[in-house]
Amino acid sequence: MVVLKYFFVILVNFSFTASIGHAYFQARLPKEVFDVQEPSSRIEGEPGSMSYRVRDCRKVSVTNLRRRIVNTSIQEWAYFGFEIYDLTDTRDDNPNYKREPWRRPVVDSAEALRVADSIAGYWSSTPDSAWILERQNQSWNLRGGDSRWRNPWSAAFVSWVMCESGLGDFNRFQRSVAHYSYIDQAIMSRATANSVSAFVAFDVGEKLIEPGDLLCRGSRPEYQTLAERRSQIGVGARTHCDIVIKLDSDKKRILLIGGNVRAWVRLKILPADFSNQGFLVPVPYNGRRLFAHLKLQADEVENGVFENSPSVQNLLCGGYDFYLPGIIDENSVKCVLQVKD
């Protein structure tokens, strides 16, 4: 597996900022370019005394729901410094890959402080999470404001993205501190007539995967199929889901963005192959298997939605000298005027 950090040379645009940790991140775009309420704006106070200022979701048009989910995820990835977690060489059928022992990720202290209120903002979108923030405040007071988060925040990240994308109604998306809550909602929606759930659950390979969909795995238990989870619906489980950003058929890989991926918001690259139906589907990797495909019930978008996103357009067309090999081909990207969604 490869964890990559890309560095950017700053030219004339102030939407990039250099952190003390020497990684460059892209500030969130002005609202007139992309109208997203920053997660940090939902928080009051400093590490050790943070509290929620906003808990609900504002009303956002869902006309371009799939595109907005993708664009919102990409903007957060940019704010966290364009970190990449490449797992393509860890596919289980790679004879040259040897699984490495797990090591706790190390986050730069200055960077941890910079994004603390953003992660707290993700938590604010989930119900019954006040105790988590209070626990974190206690940890910060004891260990310092740059100490790691005590609770995994990947489900909070997904919940905030959906909240900010217009899925504030719990009947549409069950925002939660744990992924299994909205996985179960998507499972039940498939068997429920007239369900208004934004996602419907399928086994991986059963349906075409598109940008804006969710792909999920289980670690405790290690679910292999959707039926295994269906038999335990409502029971707590340690699961993880990421948001699909791009299907790369030429290189047989799927690009996703998730929270708390190695303690950060990262772009994850998974190995893939074509199914018998001709779909590009993820293959087992690093001893893991995805068991659920949560398909978004929304209009399709072009597969180039990644390159066309406001954050990537700002990177490619904003006058920067950048280095992002193997992810974006700048020669194939057209600079277009972005309209606020």
Where are these regions (language model features)?
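Sec/Tat signal peptide C-region and signal peptidase I cleavage site
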Residues: 18-23
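Positively charged n-region of N-terminal signal peptides that target proteins for export
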Residues: 1-6
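Low-complexity, Gly/Ser/Thr/Pro-rich intrinsically disordered linker/tail segments
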Residues: 260-341
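Bacterial N-terminal signal peptides
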Residues: 7-15
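Short loop/turn segments at secondary-structure transitions that flank enzyme active sites
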Residues: 79, 161-164, 168, 221-223, ...
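Short, solvent-exposed loop/turn and secondary-structure capping segments
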Residues: 85-88, 172-174, 227-228, 267-269
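N-terminal capping segments
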Residues: 25-170, 314-341
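...with weaker cross-activation on analogous glycine-rich loops/strands in unrelated enzymes
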Residues: 175-262
